[in-house]
Amino acid sequence: MAELDKIEVRDITRIERIGAHSHIRGLGLDDVLEARAVSQGMVGQKDARRAAGLVVQIVREGKIAGRCILLAGEPSTGKTAIAVGMAQALGNETPFTSMSGSEIYSLEMNKTEALSQALRKSIGVRIKEETEIIEGEVVEIQIDRPASGTGQKVGKVTIKTTDMETNYDLGNKIIECFMKEKIQAGDVITIDKASGKVSKLGRSFTRARDYDATGAQTRFVQCPEGELQKRKEVVHTVTLHEIDVINSRTHGFLALFAGDTGEIKQEVRDQINSKVMEWREEGKAEINPGVLFIDEAHMLDIECFSFLNRALESDMAPVVIMATNRGITKIRGTNYRSPHGIPIDLLDRMIIIRTVPYSAKEIKEILKIRCEEEDCQINNEALMVLGRIATETSLRYAIQSITTASLVSKRRKAAEITVEDIRKVYSLFLDEKRSSKIMKEYQDEYLFYDDSLSQAEQAMEVETN
């Protein structure tokens, strides 16, 4: 008993890490696409969420391709959060590719190739295939191994359903699959005749009393009914980019695992497009246009915008969502100014969704959700102070202060975060406004201080006055 007392019990470390938007589960809309006040991690921005819900409906129907949506608003107004909510609402079946506007600049790949790959990653292809399977409960399994230990293994298996029972001879390959899956009498299995893949569905209910105790992973299922051999339709979902990589001779399918795909020739893409269209006409495949989300879209230059103008008109284009926090600014690569740093001809093709700054009540609710997500206990007074800090500084600064304040409270072994913890963190870590103020006060003491810039600023102030 003394040895048992010394055993240390530790919690299993969580694999899911807490990110900036990990608390978002969807757009928080009801059945008629009306935005709830607080739902699925989303707070406020009712008009923007309602508009995003309509875009999700367009994507789900899959009939309209090549639409471009711009999420425009001030910093910290939830543009990326809405995009994450859209990805969650669409689910895993719809391809959703997220990238930043600066990701396309690389020495290994040109800009248009990076955009082409991102666009094709966002288009899914559902390929339908009919396969023959054997499905039933294993009654008896017998494997004969050579006495020498080397050589071919042979065996027999008896599989049954509620209506019939059949014996099968097993070859070496299928025996290896059986041993890998640890198949034994009483298991309900499926065998794909084409590929030889063996899948264990669970154990039969009739064998539930075989063991006094079973693991949590043991699943009990009914014995299958009808014929042993059945035809089953299997749907494989792949993206056009994955098909491109597999058919690219210079890389092959191994590049999918390495990630180093390089540039893919346009001829390969044209052949794949024609083949996919052929499958579509024959009913073998369905095209599932997804979503490409480009954050910080003002970082794209004039060449990228020109390429997107042409790409959006293609019938194989996904729905493109861009987000930017810029006002009237220069288009990158030119000296011309434009709203959001995007050319007028591309803006004309866009549907613009505006996000507005959060109210003090909404900021408090967001901070409360973030505290729950980060598993931090906070009292009401501290939450009000944190909300006031978020209003005066920024929402991001307040969210980042939650974790640091939690560490301060744990250090003094407190059960929850208090106002004193928030004050301590506020004094230790500067926000952008206080940092800028200190820079202006002590700018003469910093290296490479440009006095001419300050003189020019003073001259501009004199002119405006």
Swiss-Prot record:
Q: Where does ATP bind?
A: G73, E74, P75, S76, T77, G78, K79, T80
Gene Ontology CC, one term: NuA4 histone acetyltransferase complex
Q: What is this protein called?
A: RuvB-like helicase 2
Q: Which Gene3D superfamilies match?
A: 1.10.8.60, P-loop containing nucleotide triphosphate hydrolases, RuvB-like helicase, domain II
Q: Which reaction does it catalyse?
A: ATP + H2O = ADP + phosphate + H(+)
**Localization annotation:** Nucleus
SMART domains given for it?
AAA
- Is Cell membrane one of the keywords? no
Recorded name of the encoding gene:
rept
Q: Give the protein family.
A: Belongs to the RuvB family.
EC nos: 3.6.4.12
Describe its function.
Answer: Acts as a transcriptional coactivator in Wg signaling. Proposed core component of the chromatin remodeling Ino80 complex which is involved in transcriptional regulation, DNA replication and probably DNA repair.
Q: Which Pfam families match?
A: TIP49, TIP49_C
The answer to whether UniProt assigns keyword Nuclease to this entry is no
User: One GO molecular-function annotation for this sequence?
Assistant: transcription corepressor activity
Q: Which domain of life is it from?
A: Eukaryota
- Enzyme class, top EC level, equals hydrolase
**Assembly notes:** Forms homohexameric rings. May form a dodecamer with pont made of two stacked hexameric rings. Component of the chromatin remodeling Ino80 complex.
PANTHER family, from UniProt?
Answer: RUVB-RELATED REPTIN AND PONTIN (PTHR11093)
Q: Name one GO biological process term.
A: negative regulation of canonical Wnt signaling pathway
Query: Where is it mostly found?
Result: nucleus
Keyword line: ATP-binding, Chromatin regulator, DNA damage, DNA repair, Helicase, Hydrolase, Nucleotide-binding, Nucleus, Repressor, Transcription, Transcription regulation
